[in-house]
Amino acid sequence: MAGRRDSESAQSDIAPLLAGYRPLPGIFDEMMDRDGRVRSHWQPLLAMFAALGPKQLSARFAAADRHVHDSGVFYRVYEETTGAERPWPLSHVPLLIDASEWQMLKAGLAQRAELLEAVLADAYGAARLVREGRVPATVIAGNPEFLRPLVGVAPAGGVHLRFYAVDVGRSPTGHWWVLGDRTQAPSGAGYALENRLALSRAMPDVYRELRVERLAPFFQDVQAELSGLNRQDDSRVCVLTPGPLNET
């Protein structure tokens, strides 16, 4: 009963903050359930927003925007020929994913990465998928990105797919869908880091109280992975970009 009373109290505290908010029909709403109640893992964040009040909340959001601007975070659109920079649109309210749901999603994405690694290793190795008729040879050999000189070449550490990103989204029923795989030039990690820096500095109390999962372990793992490929102790690892006119 106590848990139910606490939930009802939280719903009451944040009600003024959400006045006029209505979920879109036919679309899964991250914040509200079907009954129009705020999901439990969103309640602490919205309660803190409500406690800050509109004036203080606007000031915090403005501070986050200044951080993004001062850091020089921009992006470009491929279709535009001018190459003009656009300010990075910071979302002041982050997407919240419950810890248990994140563990499920993380396990599924790790499994997908292992599958893509196996496919890539086979394409440049034994080619069983082609020989067994599971994948037409033209799909691989006819792909302009297929690097024939690398067939039979063992990569350092035995791993082909070192860095992998994936676009995910919700189905209308709330299930996670994979919308796209990013294996050639995965981008987004830098934007995620800048988003986190901007919001955590503008609202340090919010991030501290909510015990948000840290991003540092990811970047530490990337650094360790790249450094592990280095056979010399005194050399440095450099990450090259496509250049200043690239979208990201």
Where are the model-predicted features located?
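Preference for protein termini
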Residues: 1-248
